[in-house]
A protein has these predicted regions:
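Active-site rim helix/loop that mediates acceptor-substrate recognition in acyltransferases
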Residues: 33-56
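Generic recognition of long tandem-repeat/solenoid scaffolds
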Residues: 4, 87, 150-152
């Protein structure tokens, strides 16, 4: 079951989590362009956001075994003032069979969407370069009312 990690846990295990996030940030073309080959500053920023006792806008989630790491961030639109939860990064650290993967996706959705509602978010955004996540989202349409949109990145 996916659990929100405490700031203390993040501080004590940051080096381990940082390695997993680096892997996630460089594992696909889109994330690699935005976060790969950059300075270490991105990880300092994330660490500071996750451990700031005065702000709880960024969150790190994990299963007890560390099989999955999910990084989320609350965003507020400058235009509409609506709050949403961005699933910034999600990665698994071990290979699992397809049934387990689908079950974990369902459990993660239940846990994170409950958290988003508690934070007064009006929705959740998830970007992915992986067709698999779009296919999973499509399969949940009946019970999540997911709206699948397209996003484009033109590297400059």
């Amino acid at each position: 079951m996916l659990k929100l990690l405490s700031q203390e846990d993040i501080k004590n295990n940051w080096n381990e989590y940082k390695v997993i996030l680096k892997k996630a940030f460089t594992s696909s073309e889109g994330t690699h362009i935005l976060t790969g080959e950059g300075s270490e500053n991105i990880y300092k920023v994330i660490y500071n956001k996750l451990t700031n006792p005065f702000s709880h806008d960024m969150h790190l989630w994990s299963e007890g075994e560390g099989d999955y790491i999910v990084l989320t961030q609350i965003q507020v639109s400058d235009i509409t003032d609506k709050q949403t939860l961005l699933l910034f990064s999600a990665t698994r650290t071990k290979e699992v069979d397809k049934d387990t993967l689908t079950e974990r996706y369902y459990e993660a959705y239940q846990t994170i969407s409950k958290f988003a509602r508690e934070q007064n978010c009006e929705g959740m955004y998830c970007y992915s370069d992986l067709d698999y996540f779009a296919e999973l989202a499509e399969q949940t349409k009946e019970w999540t009312n997911v709206i699948i949109r397209y996003q484009f990145l033109f590297p400059l």
